[in-house]
Amino acid sequence: MNLKKLIIILTIILMPFSSNAEESTNIDQYTQFSVYTGMFDFSDDGKKSTLIGFQHQNENLNRDTFLGNLSPVTGALITADNAGYIYTGVQAQYKIGALNFTPSFTPGLYHEGNGKDLGHLIEFKSELQISLDLSKNSELGFSYNHLSNASLGDKNPGANSYMFNFFKNF
């Protein structure tokens, strides 16, 4: 087989798998990463603790529903008392001009470390976040959340936390 025939055959085979520049620019590769810090269980004087955490959101997986634009989120936090929480769940986003309102619900796994005993390994985080667009690719926000085991354990004290958030889109 000569080289010319080989090139023609390879071109025909690979043509359906190629994309041109116009198609590539229409594909949105937007992902959001946020870091946050705040106060874990601020309403309990005996067990409140500072926290730091991160969260990832992939906009390519979002869905428009009757509840709004929903997308999956995954993240983790750790407190100064070595308590930790890893989670994954869903958030909705509502925009009013430069303001963003983002409620979320994320089940996860909690480890108390030297911090507050929340009564169970499985905890549910309900959160409301308000943020302001700083630029096309960044936001600054404030959020409040409640962590609870929904009475899965013998006790369910819950924890209320607030955080300051910085978001960066990539």
Region annotations inferred by a language model:
Residues F40-T50, A76-Y87, N114-L121, S151-A159:
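Solvent-exposed loop/turn segments connecting transmembrane beta-strands
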Residues Q32-D41, L67-T79, T102-L109, Y144-S148:
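Transmembrane beta-strand segments that form the barrel wall of outer-membrane beta-barrel proteins
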Residues H56-N58, A92-Y94, L132, H146, ...:
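Residue-level signature of outer-membrane beta-barrel architecture
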Residues D81-F105:
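Helix-adjacent hinge/juxtasegments
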Residues K48-F54, L132, P157-F170:
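Outer-membrane beta-barrel "beta-signal"
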Residues N20-Y30, D44-D45, N60-L70, K95-F101, ...:
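Short loop/turn motifs that connect adjacent beta-strands in outer-membrane beta-barrel proteins
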Residues L99-S126:
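Mid-chain, well-packed structural core segment of small domains
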Residues M1-D28:
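Cleavable N-terminal export/targeting peptides
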